[in-house]
């Protein structure tokens, strides 16, 4: 996967794509990547695709509870936010000193440091 945990991504598709700001304008929703599932090509983004989980009563809890948690979304529905230009961009791969280096295709900025 070309996106890593902790990076900020923009949501490109789905029910959580937009939010309305204080001026009434539609803005693209962004969030930090919390977890990556490589086999399924899905990621969990902070505050996006919230699901309601019902917990039944158990021996420890007399009452059941309802919690909200993030659901996964497909990797094709997000784009990395370029740290320098703050715009959504695709990610390309270059080889430098025998190592793979990621770069933003829109601005040509290098995303990884050469070790």
Curated annotation (Swiss-Prot):
- Segments carrying the region annotation (Disordered) are 49-68
Q: Which InterPro entries match?
A: Rib_uL2_dom2 (IPR014722), Ribosomal_uL24 (IPR003256), Ribosomal_uL24_KOW (IPR041988), Translation_prot_SH3-like_sf (IPR008991)
Keyword RNA-binding assigned to the entry: answer is yes
Q: Which Pfam families match?
A: ribosomal_L24 (PF17136)
**Keyword Cell inner membrane among record annotations:** no
**What is an example of a GO molecular function annotated in this UniProt entry?**
structural constituent of ribosome
Supply one GO BP term.
translation
Q: Which GO terms describe its cellular component?
A: ribonucleoprotein complex; ribosome
Alphabetically list the UniProt keywords: Ribonucleoprotein, Ribosomal protein, RNA-binding, rRNA-binding
The domain of life for this entry's organism is Bacteria
Q: Which family does it belong to?
A: Belongs to the universal ribosomal protein uL24 family.
Q: How does it assemble?
A: Part of the 50S ribosomal subunit.
**Any idea what job this protein has?**
One of two assembly initiator proteins, it binds directly to the 5'-end of the 23S rRNA, where it nucleates assembly of the 50S subunit. One of the proteins that surrounds the polypeptide exit tunnel on the outside of the subunit.
Under HAMAP family, the record lists:
Ribosomal_uL24_B
Do you know which PANTHER family this protein is assigned to? MITOCHONDRIAL RIBOSOMAL PROTEIN L24 (PTHR12903)
What name does the UniProt record give this protein?
Large ribosomal subunit protein uL24
- Source organism (scientific name): Phytoplasma australiense
């Amino acid at each position: 996967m070309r996106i890593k945990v902790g990076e900020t991504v923009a949501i490109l598709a789905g029910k959580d794509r937009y939010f309305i700001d204080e001026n009434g304008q539609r803005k693209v929703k962004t969030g930090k990547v919390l977890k990556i599932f490589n086999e399924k090509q899905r990621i969990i983004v902070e505050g996006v695709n919230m699901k309601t989980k019902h917990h039944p009563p158990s021996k420890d809890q007399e009452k059941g509870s309802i919690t909200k948690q993030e659901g996964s979304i497909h990797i094709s529905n997000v784009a990395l936010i370029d740290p320098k230009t703050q715009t959504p961009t695709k990610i390309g791969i270059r080889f430098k000193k025998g190592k793979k280096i990621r770069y933003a295709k829109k601005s040509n900025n290098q995303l990884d440091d050469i070790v």
